[in-house]
A protein has these predicted regions:
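Cofactor-binding loop segments of dinucleotide-utilizing enzymes, especially the Rossmann-like FAD-
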Residues: 16, 36, 119
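Anionic-ligand binding patches
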Residues: 2-12, 46-195
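Short loop/helix-cap segments at secondary-structure boundaries that form the rim of catalytic
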Residues: 22-26, 43, 66
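A short beta-strand-loop structural module common to alpha/beta enzyme folds
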Residues: 32-41
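A generic "binding-loop/recognition-motif" signal
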Residues: 19, 38, 182
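N-terminal beta1-alpha1 ligand-phosphate binding loop
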Residues: 2-29
Length: 195
Protein backbone atom coordinates (compact mmCIF):
# COMPACT_ATOMS: atom_id res chain seq x y z
CA UNK A 1 0.00 0.00 0.00
CA UNK A 2 1.10 3.51 -0.75
CA UNK A 3 0.65 4.80 2.81
CA UNK A 4 3.34 2.41 4.08
CA UNK A 5 5.67 3.16 1.16
CA UNK A 6 5.44 6.90 1.82
CA UNK A 7 6.55 6.63 5.46
CA UNK A 8 10.15 7.19 4.33
CA UNK A 9 9.23 10.21 2.19
CA UNK A 10 8.24 13.82 2.72
CA UNK A 11 5.58 14.88 0.20
CA UNK A 12 5.63 18.53 -0.84
CA UNK A 13 2.51 19.65 -2.70
CA UNK A 14 3.19 22.86 -4.59
CA UNK A 15 -0.43 23.83 -5.11
CA UNK A 16 -2.67 26.44 -3.58
CA UNK A 17 -5.76 24.66 -4.93
CA UNK A 18 -8.08 23.62 -2.10
CA UNK A 19 -9.46 20.87 -4.36
CA UNK A 20 -6.03 19.32 -4.95
CA UNK A 21 -5.18 19.58 -1.25
CA UNK A 22 -8.44 17.83 -0.36
CA UNK A 23 -7.70 15.02 -2.82
CA UNK A 24 -4.35 14.36 -1.12
CA UNK A 25 -6.13 14.26 2.26
CA UNK A 26 -8.74 11.88 0.81
CA UNK A 27 -5.92 9.65 -0.52
CA UNK A 28 -4.50 9.55 3.05
CA UNK A 29 -1.25 11.09 1.87
CA UNK A 30 0.47 13.34 4.40
CA UNK A 31 1.89 16.43 2.74
CA UNK A 32 3.30 19.89 3.26
CA UNK A 33 2.13 22.79 1.11
CA UNK A 34 4.95 24.85 -0.34
CA UNK A 35 4.21 27.55 -2.91
CA UNK A 36 6.40 29.55 -5.26
CA UNK A 37 5.18 32.19 -7.67
CA UNK A 38 5.76 31.13 -11.28
CA UNK A 39 4.99 33.07 -14.47
CA UNK A 40 2.78 30.55 -16.28
CA UNK A 41 3.93 31.36 -19.80
CA UNK A 42 4.59 28.68 -22.39
CA UNK A 43 5.98 28.60 -25.93
CA UNK A 44 3.17 29.23 -28.43
CA UNK A 45 4.03 26.17 -30.55
CA UNK A 46 3.01 23.81 -27.73
CA UNK A 47 -0.37 22.09 -27.96
CA UNK A 48 -2.71 20.35 -25.51
CA UNK A 49 -0.81 18.09 -23.05
CA UNK A 50 2.52 19.60 -24.16
CA UNK A 51 1.35 22.83 -22.49
CA UNK A 52 0.38 21.26 -19.17
CA UNK A 53 3.51 19.08 -19.11
CA UNK A 54 5.64 22.19 -19.70
CA UNK A 55 3.87 24.23 -16.99
CA UNK A 56 3.89 21.44 -14.38
CA UNK A 57 7.64 21.00 -14.98
CA UNK A 58 8.20 24.77 -14.92
CA UNK A 59 6.54 24.91 -11.49
CA UNK A 60 8.81 22.08 -10.30
CA UNK A 61 11.90 23.84 -11.72
CA UNK A 62 11.23 26.73 -9.30
CA UNK A 63 12.30 24.40 -6.46
CA UNK A 64 15.61 23.43 -8.12
CA UNK A 65 18.30 22.84 -5.49
CA UNK A 66 15.86 23.01 -2.56
CA UNK A 67 14.84 19.35 -2.31
CA UNK A 68 16.41 17.06 0.26
CA UNK A 69 16.83 13.30 0.24
CA UNK A 70 13.41 11.78 0.91
CA UNK A 71 11.49 14.74 -0.51
CA UNK A 72 8.99 14.20 -3.31
CA UNK A 73 7.78 17.43 -4.87
CA UNK A 74 4.46 17.31 -6.71
CA UNK A 75 3.37 20.09 -9.06
CA UNK A 76 0.51 20.19 -11.52
CA UNK A 77 -1.27 22.23 -14.14
CA UNK A 78 -4.71 22.01 -15.72
CA UNK A 79 -6.05 23.57 -18.89
CA UNK A 80 -9.20 23.35 -20.91
CA UNK A 81 -8.29 22.58 -24.54
CA UNK A 82 -11.02 23.77 -26.88
CA UNK A 83 -10.98 24.21 -30.65
CA UNK A 84 -7.19 24.29 -30.81
CA UNK A 85 -6.68 26.76 -27.97
CA UNK A 86 -5.86 26.56 -24.27
CA UNK A 87 -8.34 28.16 -21.91
CA UNK A 88 -6.74 29.05 -18.61
CA UNK A 89 -8.30 30.91 -15.71
CA UNK A 90 -10.53 33.87 -16.65
CA UNK A 91 -9.28 37.34 -15.75
CA UNK A 92 -12.76 38.72 -15.05
CA UNK A 93 -16.52 38.08 -15.35
CA UNK A 94 -16.65 39.12 -19.01
CA UNK A 95 -13.93 36.64 -19.95
CA UNK A 96 -15.60 33.92 -17.85
CA UNK A 97 -18.88 34.50 -19.70
CA UNK A 98 -17.10 34.33 -23.06
CA UNK A 99 -15.30 31.10 -22.10
CA UNK A 100 -18.40 29.29 -20.85
CA UNK A 101 -20.47 30.39 -23.85
CA UNK A 102 -17.78 28.99 -26.17
CA UNK A 103 -18.04 25.58 -24.43
CA UNK A 104 -21.84 25.29 -24.59
CA UNK A 105 -23.20 22.63 -26.92
CA UNK A 106 -19.71 21.31 -27.63
CA UNK A 107 -17.11 18.87 -26.36
CA UNK A 108 -13.76 20.03 -24.99
CA UNK A 109 -10.83 18.38 -23.25
CA UNK A 110 -9.61 18.97 -19.72
CA UNK A 111 -5.92 18.13 -19.46
CA UNK A 112 -3.98 17.88 -16.21
CA UNK A 113 -0.27 17.17 -15.95
CA UNK A 114 1.40 16.18 -12.70
CA UNK A 115 5.16 16.37 -12.20
CA UNK A 116 6.98 14.33 -9.53
CA UNK A 117 10.50 15.33 -8.42
CA UNK A 118 13.14 14.14 -6.01
CA UNK A 119 16.71 15.48 -5.87
CA UNK A 120 17.75 12.83 -8.44
CA UNK A 121 14.62 11.68 -10.26
CA UNK A 122 11.71 13.21 -12.15
CA UNK A 123 8.60 12.07 -13.96
CA UNK A 124 5.66 13.89 -15.53
CA UNK A 125 2.35 12.24 -16.39
CA UNK A 126 -0.89 13.62 -17.80
CA UNK A 127 -4.55 12.75 -18.12
CA UNK A 128 -7.18 13.93 -20.59
CA UNK A 129 -10.94 13.91 -20.03
CA UNK A 130 -13.46 14.79 -22.74
CA UNK A 131 -16.32 16.92 -21.38
CA UNK A 132 -19.55 17.61 -23.28
CA UNK A 133 -21.52 20.70 -22.26
CA UNK A 134 -25.23 21.24 -22.89
CA UNK A 135 -26.53 24.55 -24.20
CA UNK A 136 -26.96 27.07 -21.38
CA UNK A 137 -28.74 30.41 -21.39
CA UNK A 138 -26.87 33.67 -20.78
CA UNK A 139 -28.97 34.03 -17.61
CA UNK A 140 -27.79 30.63 -16.30
CA UNK A 141 -24.16 31.40 -17.12
CA UNK A 142 -24.34 34.85 -15.53
CA UNK A 143 -25.97 33.40 -12.40
CA UNK A 144 -23.16 30.87 -12.09
CA UNK A 145 -20.43 33.50 -12.52
CA UNK A 146 -22.05 35.84 -9.98
CA UNK A 147 -22.69 33.15 -7.37
CA UNK A 148 -19.62 30.92 -7.76
CA UNK A 149 -16.87 33.35 -8.92
CA UNK A 150 -14.99 30.74 -11.04
CA UNK A 151 -11.90 32.90 -11.55
CA UNK A 152 -9.54 30.28 -10.12
CA UNK A 153 -10.66 27.56 -12.53
CA UNK A 154 -9.38 26.67 -15.99
CA UNK A 155 -12.16 27.24 -18.51
CA UNK A 156 -14.13 29.28 -15.95
CA UNK A 157 -16.09 26.40 -14.48
CA UNK A 158 -16.01 23.76 -11.77
CA UNK A 159 -17.63 20.47 -12.74
CA UNK A 160 -18.44 19.85 -9.06
CA UNK A 161 -20.40 23.11 -8.82
CA UNK A 162 -23.91 24.15 -9.88
CA UNK A 163 -22.97 24.63 -13.53
CA UNK A 164 -21.58 21.09 -13.69
CA UNK A 165 -24.78 19.70 -12.20
CA UNK A 166 -26.97 21.38 -14.82
CA UNK A 167 -24.61 21.84 -17.76
CA UNK A 168 -22.46 18.73 -18.19
CA UNK A 169 -24.13 16.26 -20.52
CA UNK A 170 -21.44 13.57 -20.22
CA UNK A 171 -17.72 12.97 -19.79
CA UNK A 172 -15.22 10.41 -21.08
CA UNK A 173 -12.37 9.86 -18.65
CA UNK A 174 -11.63 10.80 -15.06
CA UNK A 175 -14.12 13.05 -13.27
CA UNK A 176 -11.44 13.86 -10.69
CA UNK A 177 -9.14 15.05 -13.48
CA UNK A 178 -11.74 17.68 -14.39
CA UNK A 179 -11.94 18.77 -10.74
CA UNK A 180 -8.17 19.28 -10.86
CA UNK A 181 -6.21 16.08 -10.18
CA UNK A 182 -6.26 12.65 -11.85
CA UNK A 183 -6.20 10.86 -8.49
CA UNK A 184 -5.94 7.32 -9.86
CA UNK A 185 -2.94 8.28 -12.00
CA UNK A 186 -1.28 10.15 -9.11
CA UNK A 187 -1.70 7.13 -6.82
CA UNK A 188 -0.29 4.68 -9.40
CA UNK A 189 2.60 6.99 -10.27
CA UNK A 190 3.56 7.47 -6.61
CA UNK A 191 3.56 3.68 -6.16
CA UNK A 192 5.97 3.32 -9.12
CA UNK A 193 8.01 6.40 -8.19
CA UNK A 194 8.75 5.10 -4.68
CA UNK A 195 9.94 1.63 -5.82
Amino acid sequence: MLKEKLQDYHIILASGSPRRQQFFKDLNIEFEIRLKPVEENFPKHLKAAEITDFLAELKADAFEGELNTGDILITSDTIVWHEGSALGKPADAAQALEMIKSLCGKTHEVITSVSFRTPDKKKTVNSTTRVSFSELSNEEIQYYINEYRPFDKAGAYGIQEWIGLIGIDHIEGSYFNVVGLPTNLVYKTLLEFTD
